[in-house]
């Protein structure tokens, strides 16, 4: 499983296009080619207890249409040193 490293301030995700939802997560909207269509998915970083556990997950993901965008976004986070692999 992939997760955001414990020492990462979640505000760093905003540099990569994620927006904060006051409840408990940051999300990045993955659009199909037409940004104005209702064809979209979310790449979500979930922050349980807002600080202790941060995991990367998908919500409403149509992997057939948005797989490449999702993988590229996760790759960007890995390259920036924000993500680590952990045993689930």
Regions found by a protein language model. Give the residues of each.
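Intrinsically disordered, low-complexity regulatory regions enriched in serine/threonine/proline
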Residues: 1-2, 6, 10, 27, ...
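Short secondary-structure junctions
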Residues: 15-23, 82-87
């Amino acid at each position: 499983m992939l997760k955001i490293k414990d020492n990462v301030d979640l505000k760093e995700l905003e540099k990569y296009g994620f927006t904060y939802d006051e409840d408990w997560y940051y999300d990045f909207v993955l659009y199909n080619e037409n940004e104005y269509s209702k064809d979209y998915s979310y790449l979500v970083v979930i922050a349980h207890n807002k600080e202790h556990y941060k995991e990367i997950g998908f919500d409403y993901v149509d992997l057939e249409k948005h797989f490449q965008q999702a993988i590229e976004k996760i790759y960007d986070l890995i390259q920036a040193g924000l993500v680590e692999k952990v045993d689930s």
